[in-house]
């Protein structure tokens, strides 16, 4: 709103009233209570609009209903329009709803002008109480004001015309009342009908007056309902999104936990199978006969078919335990066949775990077909690590091919081999999807395990002591696995039950903590909700404090004035009472003197009575004699 409008209101009303304070914030959007206080203060100080409201309406506690507020403001607007003769576009319903602050300020400015020019509002009050509206009067006076000059003679003519109109209207009213009395005497039966007509007219007038406010009220109500509906919709959407997010988070956590358990079980089974294979391979045959060397050429087709069939079985079943059982059966049949088939089986198994199923299907066949030929010729692939290339070769083996220096890591080999199925990976790579926790508990055997198996198959029993050349890594791996197996075997059923109890207790604690977190979240949300109204209240407190301080200063000054007046009156009273006090003391002294005299007279009387008695007694005695 424009600041000039507020300034004009402060200038117009500030000369008339001192309370309530005409602050810019209140005048920018004046509430009904504030307007009620202004109007009642104007009536109390200036007498303008006196008699317009009842004693109940003068108290703001009784004007709380919307209709009562509208009628209160409508009366004031009608009186101001009749007295000032200027039109007012302010609507009571809009003012009560908090709209149109500029028009509300215009109403306050007109009230201030009427009070400053000391215009009488008695006639307007009577007309408004009789049910007249201020529109026609305002229009008539507006047209007359536009036509009349602004000098004093024009005003005098207007007042004279107004007086003549008054007299003529009074004469007309008198004649009309006389006619009305005659009609009443003649037509007493038509009274009820006329009353009904008057009532209907009054109702129609009230309806016309309150039609616009009702429309505005309905519009405001519809707007509020639409806003409330939009807020509810947004709130419901937000709640739905939150619930969906929580469900997704829960599913993610449960899936993560299940995946971890699956990976742990898989690693445990794999390690147990490896230990079993290692023990059986160590206890098996370590020597080779020349017949076995010769029979390798004849067994080539069988090896190829058996290896391809075994790999297809592994892929179709998908269980690693069956693969390990087949490997154990092959070891028991013959050391030569087991030595040729184990690397291919191991490689196909790890390719299934580490890579995608499609890569495993592509690589399984070539790996199973090519590896026996490589082992038959006793050729070491160039892709094997340096530790595997340093294995001592038996005397019956053919000369090794020239060594090719490769500086590629096992990780790059995994990336390169994903493209085709012809290359054979000589390094067993464990699943990379396992978590760091599983890596800390279980040590994966890769290249050293393959080198150990090849060493056991190719080297005679007398050369098994060369395992020490691998370093302490294999020994540490075996020791940790043995310790883990001992721990697994040493676990008693009671301890397992205890671990289950601990898990259930941990879950309960987790549920309790999640509930407490939920409660904390709810309390934080309620705190944030209550923070906004608290901030608004703090904004209004400043205004209330200023008003209270001004009122306190006013009462302090009034108290001081009354105390001074009391002291002056006290001094005047004391000065007036002092001579009276002196007279009173004198009178009291005189009273005391008179009482003393009375006492003395009484004493004389008593003495005289005694004398008289004695004389009478003596006379009596003398007469007897």
Curated annotation (Swiss-Prot):
Consequences of knocking out this gene: Homozygous mutant mice are not viable and have neural development defects, abnormal neural tube patterning, polydactyly, cardiac edema, and variable microphthalmia. Mutant cells have a marked reduction in the number of cilia.
Comp. bias (Polar residues): 141-152, 420-434
Pfam families, alphabetized: MIP-T3 (PF10243), MIP-T3_C (PF17749)
Molecular function in Gene Ontology: microtubule binding; signaling receptor binding; tubulin binding
Annotated spans, Disordered: 130-439
Chain coiled-coil ranges: 472-600
Stretch list, region Abolishes microtubules binding when missing: 1-322
Location of the protein in the cell: Cytoplasm, Cytoskeleton; Cell projection, Cilium; Cytoplasm, Cytoskeleton, Cilium axoneme; Cytoplasm, Cytoskeleton, Cilium basal body
Key words of the record: Cell projection, Cilium, Cilium biogenesis/degradation, Coiled coil, Cytoplasm, Cytoskeleton, Phosphoprotein
Bias kind Basic and acidic residues: ranges: 153-327
DISC1-interaction domain as annotated region, ranges: 229-625
Hydrolase keyword on record: no
Oligomeric and partner information: Interacts with IL13RA1. Binds to microtubules, TRAF3 and DISC1. Component of the IFT complex B, at least composed of IFT20, IFT22, IFT25, IFT27, IFT46, IFT52, TRAF3IP1/IFT54, IFT57, IFT74, IFT80, IFT81, and IFT88. Interacts with IFT88. Interacts with MAP4.
Name of the molecule in the record: TRAF3-interacting protein 1
């Amino acid at each position: 709103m424009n600041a000039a409008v507020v300034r004009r209101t402060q200038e117009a009303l500030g000369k008339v009233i001192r309370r309530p304070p005409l602050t810019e914030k209140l005048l920018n959007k004046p509430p009904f209570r504030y307007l009620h206080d202004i109007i009642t203060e104007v009536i109390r100080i200036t007498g303008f609009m006196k008699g317009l409201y009842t004693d109940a309406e003068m108290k703001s506690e009784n004007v709380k209903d919307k209709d009562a507020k509208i009628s209160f403001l409508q009366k004031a607007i009608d009186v101001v329009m009749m007295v000032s003769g200027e039109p007012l576009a302010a609507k009571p319903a809009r003012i009560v709803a908090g709209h149109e602050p500029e028009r509300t300020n215009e109403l306050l400015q007109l009230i201030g002008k009427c009070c400053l020019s000391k215009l009488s509002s008695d006639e307007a009050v009577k007309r408004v109480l009789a049910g007249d509206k201020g529109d026609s009067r305002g229009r008539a006076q507006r047209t007359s004001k536009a036509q009349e000059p602004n000098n004093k003679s024009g005003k005098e003519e207007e007042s004279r015309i107004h007086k003549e109109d008054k007299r003529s209207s009074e004469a007309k009213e008198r004649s009309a009342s006389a006619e009305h009395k005659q009609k009443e005497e003649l037509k007493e039966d038509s009274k009820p009908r006329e009353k009904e007509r008057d009532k209907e007219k009054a109702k129609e007038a009230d309806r016309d007056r309150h039609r616009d406010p009702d429309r505005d009220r309905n519009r405001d109500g519809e707007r509020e309902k639409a806003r409330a509906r939009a807020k509810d919709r947004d709130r419901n959407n937000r709640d739905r999104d939150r619930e969906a997010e929580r469900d997704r988070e829960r599913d993610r956590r449960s899936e993560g936990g299940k995946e971890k358990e699956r990976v742990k079980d898989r690693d445990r089974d794999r390690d147990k199978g490896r230990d079993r294979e290692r023990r059986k391979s160590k206890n098996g045959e370590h020597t080779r006969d020349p017949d076995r060397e010769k029979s390798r050429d004849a067994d080539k087709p069988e090896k190829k078919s058996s290896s391809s069939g075994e790999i297809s079985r592994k892929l179709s079943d998908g269980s690693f335990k069956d693969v390990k059982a087949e490997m154990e059966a092959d070891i028991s049949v013959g050391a030569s066949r087991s030595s040729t088939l184990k690397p291919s089986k191991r490689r196909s198994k790890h390719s299934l775990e580490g890579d995608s199923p499609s890569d495993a299907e592509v690589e399984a066949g070539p790996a199973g077909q090519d590896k026996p030929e490589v082992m038959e010729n006793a050729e070491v692939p160039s892709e094997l690590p340096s530790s595997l290339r340093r294995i001592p070769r038996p005397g019956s083996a053919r000369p090794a091919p020239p060594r090719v220096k490769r500086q590629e890591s096992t990780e790059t080999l995994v990336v390169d081999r994903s493209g085709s199925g012809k290359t054979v990976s000589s390094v067993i790579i464990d699943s990379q999807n396992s978590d760091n926790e599983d890596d800390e508990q279980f040590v994966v055997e890769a290249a050293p395990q393959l080198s150990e198996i090849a060493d056991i198959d190719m080297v005679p029993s007398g050369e098994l002591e060369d395992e020490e050349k691998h370093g302490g890594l294999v020994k540490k791996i075996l020791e940790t696995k043995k310790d883990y197996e001992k721990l697994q075997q040493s676990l008693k059923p009671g301890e397992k039950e205890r671990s289950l109890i601990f898990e259930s207790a941990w879950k309960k604690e987790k549920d309790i903590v999640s509930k407490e977190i939920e409660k904390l979240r709810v309390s934080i949300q309620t705190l944030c909700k209550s923070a906004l109204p608290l901030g608004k209240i703090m904004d209004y407190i400043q205004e209330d404090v200023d008003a209270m301080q001004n009122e306190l200063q006013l009462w302090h000054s009034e108290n001081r004035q009354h105390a001074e007046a009391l002291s002056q009156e006290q001094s005047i009273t004391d000065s007036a009472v002092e001579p009276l006090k002196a007279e009173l003391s004198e009178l009291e002294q005189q009273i005391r003197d008179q009482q003393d005299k009375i006492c003395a007279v009484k004493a004389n009387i008593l003495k005289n009575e005694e004398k008289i008695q004695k004389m009478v007694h003596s006379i009596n005695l003398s007469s007897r004699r």
